[in-house]
Amino acid sequence: MNLEEYFARTGYKGSLENQDLETLTDIFQHHIRAVPFENLSIHCGEKITLELEHVYNKIVHKKRGGWCMENNQLLGWVLKCLGYDTSFLGAYVFNPHENAYATIMTHLLVKVVIEGKAYIVDAGFGVSYQMWQPMELVSGKDQPQAPGIFRFTEKNAIWYLEKMRRKQYIPNQNFSNSDLLEKKDCRKVYMFSLEPRTVEDFCFQCTYLQTSPDSLFTKKSICTLQTTDGFRALIGWTLTETKYNYKENMDLVEFITLKDEEVEKTLKDKFNITLERKLVPINVKGFYTI
């Protein structure tokens, strides 16, 4: 494993001299625009494991993506190698269809401290809830970014992340009531404490999310990648392309339904992913909004 290979994978060619916020942001943005958030291994007969060497080989050599435990673990390793003050945290993701936070800690986060200020660096959420810049860990402060306005709120040592979105313009009216569309203007994303975590704390969750019939990830094949002006997502056979602030305070969301024979080419053309095994797309209704 080496940093040169990782940066070749993400296309980052900037300076590595300073462990500052500007460099961190640039490295982070290259990661989220090159490495998809995806769970395709589950739906093509592969097992997801959390050994760093396996994650590195999958993302850097095989040019795949991963979910939070893979993306953020790899990014955390990179930042630590560069000399950043880096640690892992664990979050409980909000389920909009149950209107409740998960009871299992399934989301791995990176915390970075720069000149005494703490930032959350999360390269593993995907779709419109994917931050584009590290977020300062302060309570009650609106932090506007291209995807929308993010905000942390702290209550009794628990931190909550929420996001305010823009209106959405959907040209294909057949999808105007899609269950993939978020209806609320303000959306809870996840909650977490500042207790340091290790990758080993997520071993049970990694197996559970791949195997449980109750897991979102067994119900939907997901591949999503941030672009320079929005993001793409392939959920089952449904391809969406979102452009942020297409018009004032409005995002453009385009929907297409793919045929089986179009999925493989779309993964290659839109997400730069080539799978070694045959993907079996799945999209059980509910449980997930983009």
Curated annotation (Swiss-Prot):
Keywords: Acyltransferase, Transferase
GO MF annotation terms: arylamine N-acetyltransferase activity
Major enzyme class: transferase
One Pfam family, short name: Acetyltransf_2
EC number: 2.3.1.5
Chemical reaction(s) catalysed: an arylamine + acetyl-CoA = an N-acetylarylamine + CoA
Active site location: 68 (acyl-thioester intermediate), 107, 122
PANTHER family, per the entry: ARYLAMINE N-ACETYLTRANSFERASE 1, N-HYDROXYARYLAMINE O-ACETYLTRANSFERASE
Family (UniProt): Belongs to the arylamine N-acetyltransferase family.
Protein name listed in UniProt: Arylamine N-acetyltransferase, pineal gland isozyme NAT-10
